[in-house]
C-alpha cells in the first residue's frame, strides 16, 4: 500500500512555522493591568520621529509636537472629539513612497490591523518605514466582537491569535507579545457594558478575580487581544 503523493516538504514547513511561534517572547505583565499606552510613551520618549497609524496615540504624544506624524485612510476632522486630520492621507496596505522608508524610529498601530484588508502588506510597510533598530508597537484583537460602524467608514476584517501575530512579525529581529485579559475576562469583555461599567470601576483586579479560577490562567493563547513590540534589525538593508 502506497502513501499519499507528496507535493511539499510538509514536515519541514511545520517545523519552520512552529519555530516562528516559539521565538516570540511572551510577557504577562499586562494580562490584568493594561498599561500598554504608558509603555509606548516611555519607549518612544527619545524617538526622533514617530509614525502613529490611525492616530491612536495622539492624546498621549501631543507633547512631542512635530516629532509625531499621523497617517489615516480617512480625512476626518471633528471638533470636540479625539479625531483630527492626519498629517498623511494614505492606505496602510499599499506600498509607502520612498521618502517614508527608514524615516521613523517608531511606528505605532494600535487597534488598526483588524481594520485593514491586507495585514501582511501593512506590516511590511511599517517595517520599511522604520529606521534600523526602530520599533513597531501594535495592539490587535483576538477574542473580540465585530466593531465597524454602520457607515463602514472603516471596516472590520481580521482577528489575530498568538500564532498569527508571531507569523506577521516574523521578519523582525525581536518580538514580544503581551496578552491582554485571560480566558474568562476576555469573554466578559465581549459584553459592551463590561469595560465602561465594570473594568473602569474595579480596575484589572476584577479580571484577575475571574481568570485565576482555572489552574492554567497564566496562558498566552486565550486573550481578548495582544499588545506587541517588534524590533527591526540594526543592519542596513
Identify what each model region corresponds to.
Residues 1-106, 110, 223-226, 233-237:
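Conserved N-terminal segment of class I S-adenosyl-L-methionine
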Residues 66-70, 86-87, 124-129, 154-156:
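Glycine-rich, phosphate-binding/catalytic loops in enzymes
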Residues 110-113, 139:
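Residues lining the SAM
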Amino acid at each position: 500500500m502506497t502513501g499519499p503523493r507528496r507535493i511539499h516538504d510538509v514536515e519541514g514547513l511545520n517545523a519552520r512555522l512552529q519555530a516562528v511561534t516559539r521565538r516570540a517572547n511572551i510577557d504577562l505583565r499586562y494580562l490584568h493591568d493594561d498599561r500598554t499606552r504608558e509603555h509606548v510613551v516611555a519607549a518612544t520618549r527619545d524617538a526622533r520621529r514617530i509614525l502613529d497609524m490611525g492616530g491612536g496615540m495622539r492624546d498621549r504624544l501631543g507633547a512631542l509636537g512635530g516629532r509625531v506624524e499621523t497617517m489615516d485612510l480617512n480625512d476626518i476632522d471633528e471638533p470636540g472629539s479625539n479625531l483630527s486630520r492626519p498629517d498623511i492621507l494614505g492606505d496602510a496596505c499599499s506600498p509607502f513612497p520612498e521618502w517614508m522608508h527608514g524615516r521613523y524610529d517608531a511606528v505605532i498601530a494600535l487597534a488598526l490591523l483588524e481594520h485593514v484588508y491586507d495585514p501582511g502588506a501593512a506590516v511590511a510597510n511599517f517595517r520599511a518605514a522604520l529606521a534600523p533598530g526602530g520599533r513597531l508597537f501594535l495592539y490587535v484583537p483576538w477574542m473580540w466582537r465585530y466593531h465597524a460602524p454602520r457607515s463602514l467608514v472603516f471596516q472590520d476584517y481580521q482577528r489575530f491569535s498568538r500564532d498569527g501575530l508571531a507569523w506577521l512579525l516574523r521578519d523582525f529581529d525581536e518580538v514580544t507579545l503581551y496578552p491582554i485579559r485571560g480566558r474568562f475576562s476576555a469573554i466578559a469583555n465581549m459584553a459592551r457594558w463590561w469595560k465602561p461599567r465594570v473594568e473602569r470601576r474595579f480596575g484589572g483586579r476584577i479580571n484577575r478575580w475571574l481568570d485565576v479560577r482555572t489552574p492554567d490562567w497564566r496562558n498566552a493563547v486565550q486573550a481578548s487581544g495582544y499588545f506587541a513590540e517588534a524590533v527591526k534589525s540594526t543592519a542596513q538593508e
